[in-house]
A protein has these predicted regions:
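Short, small-residue-biased leader/transition segments that mark boundaries at the very start
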Residues: 1-12
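Extended, hydrophobic alpha-helical segments in both membrane/secreted and soluble proteins
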Residues: 13, 101, 114-128, 132-227, ...
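A short core secondary-structure module
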Residues: 13-61
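Glycine-rich beta->alpha junctions and the first turn(s) of the following alpha-helix
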Residues: 60-159, 235-240, 253-256, 268-355
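Generic structural signal for well-ordered, non-transmembrane alpha-helical segments
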Residues: 119, 150-156, 160, 185, ...
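C-terminal helix-coil-helix/basic helical segment that borders enzyme active sites and/or dimer interfaces
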Residues: 159-192, 203-213, 337, 359-391, ...
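Glycine-rich phosphate/cofactor-binding loops in nucleotide/flavin-utilizing enzymes
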Residues: 209-307, 406-466
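C-terminal catalytic subdomain
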Residues: 243-260, 347-365, 371-374, 379
Length: 466
């Protein structure tokens, strides 16, 4: 079909689930945001990607979805009734749709989202500096206040780290020799989370004008920089291509998959006592030397960049902390055993520590490269600012791996889900989530009732409608 009839509201149907007979696919169901139908003939064992002609009979766009930010997103609520898709519209091989989708996700996570986030942060950087230098409060520019100097220094260090980590992952992707699933996910989390924080800090420096839209400021001749739009847009990149809360456990499980597979027979519950003892001896034979090795300092690779006097001390810290993280992870696996798969209190901290360690390595090597190739010696100040912040986070999270109070807050959250704290909703007009659906239905019904009554517009306000 002509290009104009393809995807007017969606960019790609990546993993529609359907059986593919000899000549055509029949689709039935409805979708929102990511099109995955539930209908006759659907088989969750066969994920096949194909192009859907949006002008095909039975395809109907019910609604163009609207979002907090990124107003140009072409996502929609679609319905499909007996839609027939020619088999020549299948992309690649039948049953390989999920594989294609996950491959595309690596590109989005590791390349697209870090690039977008980095661009947004860079776009906000110079206007934020100009605001800090130009805004005077109580006869003193914001730039002369320690609170704002610390805030801007932290922003600068993390902006440099985002660029360094992104460049590292992009180089790995360009080589086409590496499985970058973990690195892509880490880059996505790091850049999206720190961009949100970066932009919110910038908005704080703009004060009330940071909450005002660019169009409103332009109307009276102010500098029409839309920091509020960047803040709204950035939230999407925390969610898109894998939400942070999903990716953190994913990274840990991917990174530890060979350890989890090694211990799986022991926790399966299918072994006799004798077989369990044999399995323990086998695991001990592997993990005893592994554990002892992680107490011993490992030499850094022989490379001039790693031997740089400002790089090597940080890399030794990363090497030392990586061994400690490996030991702490081993303790956690022994402590929680089979339950470790769902122990997100520990998994999230393990991922966060590893994320900062990878970003530290990328930042120091990027600073060395910038100095060697471009003579930019000021980058060491940026690297040091990030180093300070990252080490503080790492130290805190290492401590929390064994000493945290998440059990208390987790129990409170569970009790809240069971309805134990009704007083938290007191003092307002109480509504449940479904009440807003009914409210929307009433709002749609009122204009139709007005039209059916044929009441002049000037008199509609006098009607006493229920």
């Amino acid at each position: 079909p002509p290009r104009s009839t393809l995807f007017p509201y969606t960019t790609l149907f990546r993993s529609l689930i359907a059986r593919v007979p000899a000549r055509q696919v029949v689709l039935e169901g409805q979708t929102s945001w990511i099109p995955v139908p539930e209908g006759k003939g659907a088989d969750d064992r066969v994920h096949t990607a194909f192009i859907l002609d949006m002008s095909a009979p039975g395809v109907q766009v019910r609604q163009r979805c609207q979002f907090e930010g990124c107003r140009g997103i072409e996502n929609a609520h679609l319905t499909m009734q007996q839609v027939r898709v020619p088999v020549e519209n299948v992309i690649g091989e039948v049953g390989k749709g999920l594989k294609y989708a996950l491959t595309i996700l690596n590109v989005g996570r590791g390349i697209s989202i870090p690039a977008i986030c980095l661009g947004m942060a860079k776009q906000a950087w110079q206007p934020t500096l100009d605001r800090a230098n130009g805004r005077v409060t109580f006869h003193k520019p914001l730039a002369e206040r320690q609170t704002q100097q610390i805030r801007l220094g932290d922003m600068a260090g993390h902006l440099f780290a985002m660029e360094a980590l992104s460049m590292l992952v992009w180089r790995l992707a360009d080589q086409h020799r590496h499985d970058i699933r973990i690195e892509a996910a880490v880059a996505k989390i790091f850049c999206s989370e720190h961009t949100i924080r970066f932009l919110r800090d910038a908005q704080i420096l703009f004060g009330g004008m940071g909450y005002e839209t660019a169009a409103s400021k332009m109307a009276r001749g102010e500098a029409a920089f839309g920091i509020e739009q960047l803040v709204r847009d950035a939230e999407m990149y925390r969610i898109g291509e894998g939400a942070t809360d999903i990716l953190r456990p994913f990274i840990v499980r991917e990174g530890l998959s060979h350890h989890l597979d090694r211990a799986k027979p022991l926790y399966s519950g299918e072994l006799s006592i004798l077989d369990q003892l044999k399995q323990l001896v086998k695991l001990g034979g592997f993990y005893l030397p592994w554990y002892m090795r992680h107490w011993l300092r490992q030499p850094l690779p022989d490379d001039s960049a790693l031997a740089h006097p400002q790089v090597s001390p940080v890399l030794r810290y990363v090497e030392r902390t990586s061994r400690r993280l490996a030991r702490e992870t081993f303790y956690a696996m022994v402590r929680f055993q089979a339950a470790f798969q769902d122990e997100q209190r520990v998994q999230n901290r393990i991922e966060s520590i590893g994320e900062d360690l990878l970003a530290l390595v990328a930042t120091l090597l990027y600073a060395e490269q910038q100095t060697r190739l471009e003579g930019r010696t000021t980058v060491w100040e940026l690297a040091e600012a990030f180093d300070v912040a990252a080490r503080q986070r790492i130290s805190r999270r290492l401590h929390e791996l064994r000493h945290h109070r998440d059990g208390i807050t987790g129990t409170t959250g569970l009790q809240a889900l069971k309805g134990y704290y009704p007083g938290l909703s007191s003092g307002i007009v109480h509504r449940r989530l479904d009440d807003y659906r009914r409210q929307a239905a009433v709002s749609e019904a009122i204009p139709m009732a007005m039209a059916s009554l044929s009441v002049p517009m000037k008199d509609q306000g006098r009607l006493n409608l229920p």
